[in-house]
Amino acid sequence: MKAPGLPADQQFFADLFSGLVLNPQLLGRVWFASQPASLPVGSLCIDFPRLDIVLRGEYGNLLEAKQQRLVEGEMLFIPARAANLPVNNKPVMLLSLVFAPTWLGLSFYDSRTTSLLHPARQIQLPSLQRGEGEAMLTALTHLSRSPLEQNIIQPLVLSLLHLCRSVVNMPPGNSQPRGDFLYHSICNWVQDNYAQPLTRESVAQFFNITPNHLSKLFAQHGTMRFIEYVRWVRMAKARMILQKYHLSIHEVAQRCGFPDSDYFCRVFRRQFGLTPGEYSARFQG
């Protein structure tokens, strides 16, 4: 039964979730991505848990030998700050979920019409990952250390899909005010795409608003201007990379959205009082 009054994209995902939860026998093994010592070029790594579900065809994770051929019904759970490198040369329909603290991100990929870099459909819905949802995600993250416990893992993922279905079936009028949700959506999107060449104009265009509207959102709902927020996110990512990974300063700058490593070093030193090299030395010792 279709939920009443849902926008077209939201109804599309509502139908997808209905097909999944009403046919659990079609769901297969749940695989788990891990956190690599270094991040290969092209790999995906964000601060939120993710779940990729193969709806049709073949998918895979090139970072794990046993995960390079995932077939219809199989799933890949990527804990927060874990990474995957998608196989993108096979015919596939894929549903990808992102579990952020205040929103649920849904993307549908169809290799017949788009690549795995560009979703055919994509929405973000307000959803506080607290209580039941947070407990499920925490449990799955812990179970990633015991991936063979499929008799526990699969029912847990099915319960998570039921919860997602309830979020997707919620009419937009029952959600938080649009301005607040849009502001948090932009902030979270920047956290996922900080390595890209972001400008006020390009981000505003992506969210189908004017640059002035974007600036107004940050003035009303945030504590810093948009460009300052982008710089803050990039600096936070740079600190994390410098603490955990043995990369050149040029590589760190590139991964954090700074094509000019000299400018990256100046910004980093101005913000933290140390050069990136000095900061890294404190942790890499």
From Swiss-Prot:
<dbReference type="InterPro" id="IPR009057">
    <property type="entry name" value="Homeodomain-like_sf"/>
</dbReference>
<protein>
    <recommendedName>
        <fullName>Uncharacterized HTH-type transcriptional regulator YpdC</fullName>
    </recommendedName>
</protein>
<dbReference type="Pfam" id="PF12833">
    <property type="entry name" value="HTH_18"/>
</dbReference>
<feature type="DNA-binding region" description="H-T-H motif">
    <location>
        <begin position="249"/>
        <end position="272"/>
    </location>
</feature>
<dbReference type="GO" id="GO:0043565">
    <property type="term" value="F:sequence-specific DNA binding"/>
</dbReference>
<keyword id="KW-0238">DNA-binding</keyword>
<dbReference type="InterPro" id="IPR018060">
    <property type="entry name" value="HTH_AraC"/>
</dbReference>
<feature type="DNA-binding region" description="H-T-H motif">
    <location>
        <begin position="201"/>
        <end position="222"/>
    </location>
</feature>
<keyword id="KW-0804">Transcription</keyword>
<keyword id="KW-0805">Transcription regulation</keyword>
<feature type="domain" description="HTH araC/xylS-type">
    <location>
        <begin position="184"/>
        <end position="282"/>
    </location>
</feature>
<dbReference type="GO" id="GO:0003700">
    <property type="term" value="F:DNA-binding transcription factor activity"/>
</dbReference>
<dbReference type="InterPro" id="IPR020449">
    <property type="entry name" value="Tscrpt_reg_AraC-type_HTH"/>
</dbReference>
<dbReference type="InterPro" id="IPR018062">
    <property type="entry name" value="HTH_AraC-typ_CS"/>
</dbReference>
